[in-house]
């Protein structure tokens, strides 16, 4: 009997999927099984569109199509929680399995607390994540550092602190992530600061960290994180679609060491990005960025991209706003940003969506991440975990 907190090395029983998927195709097999058995109505994942740098959400209803979404896409920066609420009605009337990075999973949990996502209808298959990369700079990085045509890259992966790319002719090149980031490339800045790499708030947490011995590179390390995850894995095992074996104890230790090293690296980047990390109060953080806020065009891009912003009638709109929000001014009053902060910052998961779409290049993710960290210190609230309600959240009727 599989239980919460159990760990396994897993690989697909289907040789074709094991070859097409990464690390034994365990995730692909689980998603296909869930669809084929009617446990879910659809699978929400990501797929490449024009190329590896153009990553889009994909809703899969045919089990045979699941393999199309197999493999890593580190240039995929979108947050799938936004897709669930905006286009799938929060899974209110359909059952879905969603592949989630840690920030996706944490956002889903926050939206479940607000009853914007039906937790009973969602299975979260978590994927370990050490960070994603901005696609435009990614193409530039391929030309300048790897000296290859960006369009010739057919595969990329992050392993042992290096970004490894493979081109059409089978050539592999690798460069340490640290070297790329020292030059302003590599992972997104919000990903560098992120201290959550294993999505234990999902139902299953899957990745290649800790798989050693004969199955190294041929199996997925799966940690069971919820009773729902245990039930899914048990059913897949009983159906014979997935092979499980106990992980090597040394592998468990290695996995924890990798996670610990990534957390330390995130702490370093937080120290680099945030002045006086331990000492500043919340409002002094906002004061620090007034010059940045002066570049705001009031385009509402941050609101539209933020997966935590979901109100149908937004108080930031001129006809809905309170008296202290000035109307028709560009840039808007700092109260514009303060009002938005009060609505979402305790649940900010540092997914970086706001910063990516800002035409004024305001470092929004950096600002809100720092404020969120201050709120954690003040209230002890950890976003994206458990079922505790956010400390200052309010949920207007009808929103």
UniProtKB/Swiss-Prot annotation:
The keyword Protease does not apply. [4Fe-4S] cluster 2 binds at residues 306, 348, 351, 354. Transmembrane segments: none annotated. Its cofactor is [4Fe-4S] cluster; FAD; Zn(2+). Is extremely sensitive to oxygen. Contains a FAD that is required for coenzyme F420-dependent activity but not for methyl viologen-dependent activity. Preincubation of the FAD-depleted enzyme with FAD restores coenzyme F420-dependent activity. Neither FMN nor FADH2 can replace FAD. Strongly inhibited by cyanide, azide, alpha,alpha-dipyridyl and 1,10-phenanthroline. Binds 2 [4Fe-4S] clusters. Optimum pH is 7.9 (when assayed with coenzyme F420). Residues 287-307, 339-367 form the 4Fe-4S ferredoxin-type domain. It comes from the Archaea. The keyword Flavoprotein applies. Optimum temperature is 55 degrees Celsius. [4Fe-4S] cluster 1 binds at residues 296, 299, 302, 358. Keywords: 4Fe-4S, Electron transport, FAD, Flavoprotein, Iron, Iron-sulfur, Metal-binding, Oxidoreductase, Repeat, Transport, Zinc. Pfam families: FrhB_FdhB_C, FrhB_FdhB_N. GO terms for molecular function: 4 iron, 4 sulfur cluster binding; formate dehydrogenase (coenzyme F420) activity; formate dehydrogenase (NAD+) activity; metal ion binding; oxidoreductase activity, acting on CH or CH2 groups, with an iron-sulfur protein as acceptor. It catalyses: oxidized coenzyme F420-(gamma-L-Glu)(n) + formate + 2 H(+) = reduced coenzyme F420-(gamma-L-Glu)(n) + CO2. Belongs to the FrhB family. Catalyzes the oxidation of formate to carbon dioxide, with coenzyme F420 as the electron acceptor. In vitro can also use methyl viologen, 7,8-didemethyl-8-hydroxy-5-deazariboflavin (or FO, a hydrolytic derivative of coenzyme F420), FMN and FAD as electron acceptors, but not NAD(+) or NADP(+). This is F420-dependent formate dehydrogenase subunit beta. It comes from Methanobacterium formicicum.
């Amino acid at each position: 009997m599989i239980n919460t907190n159990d760990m396994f090395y897993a690989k697909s029983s289907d040789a074709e999927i094991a070859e097409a998927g990464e690390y034994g195709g365990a995730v692909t097999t689980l998603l296909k099984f869930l669809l084929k058995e009617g446990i879910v109505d659809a699978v929400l994942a990501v797929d490449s569109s024009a190329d590896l740098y153009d990553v889009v959400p994909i809703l899969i209803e045919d089990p045979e199509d699941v393999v199309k979404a197999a493999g890593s896409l580190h240039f995929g920066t979108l947050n799938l929680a936004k897709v669930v609420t905006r286009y799938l009605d929060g899974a209110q009337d359909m059952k879905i399995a969603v592949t989630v990075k840690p920030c996706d999973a944490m956002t889903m949990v926050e939206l479940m607390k607000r009853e914007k996502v039906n937790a009973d209808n969602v299975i979260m298959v978590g994927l370990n994540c050490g960070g994603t990369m901005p696609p435009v700079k990614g193409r530039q990085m391929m030309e300048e550092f790897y000296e290859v045509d960006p369009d010739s890259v057919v595969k990329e992966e992050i392993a042992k602190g290096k970004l490894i790319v493979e081109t059409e002719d089978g050539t592999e090149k690798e460069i340490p992530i640290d070297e790329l980031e020292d030059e302003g490339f590599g992972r997104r800045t919000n990903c560098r600061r992120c201290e959550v790499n294993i999505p234990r708030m999902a139902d299953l947490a899957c990745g290649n960290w800790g798989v050693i011995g004969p199955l190294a590179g041929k199996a997925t390390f799966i940690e069971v994180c919820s009773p729902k995850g245990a039930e899914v894995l048990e059913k897949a095992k009983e159906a014979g679609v997935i092979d499980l074996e106990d992980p090597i104890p040394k592998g468990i230790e290695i996995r924890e060491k990798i996670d610990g090293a990534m957390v330390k690296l995130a702490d370093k980047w937080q120290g680099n990005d945030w002045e006086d990390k331990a000492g500043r109060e919340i409002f002094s953080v906002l004061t620090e960025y007034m010059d940045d806020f002066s570049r705001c065009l009031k385009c509402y891009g941050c609101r539209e991209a933020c997966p935590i912003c979901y109100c149908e009638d937004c108080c930031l709109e001129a006809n809905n706003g309170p008296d202290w929000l000035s109307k028709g001014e560009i840039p808007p009053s700092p109260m514009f940003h303060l009002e938005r902060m009060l609505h979402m910052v305790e649940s900010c998961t540092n997914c970086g969506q706001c910063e990516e779409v800002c035409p004024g290049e305001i470092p929004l993710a950096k600002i809100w991440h720092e404020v969120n960290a201050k709120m954690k210190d003040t209230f002890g609230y950890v976003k994206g975990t458990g079922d505790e309600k956010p400390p200052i959240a309010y949920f207007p009727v009808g929103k």
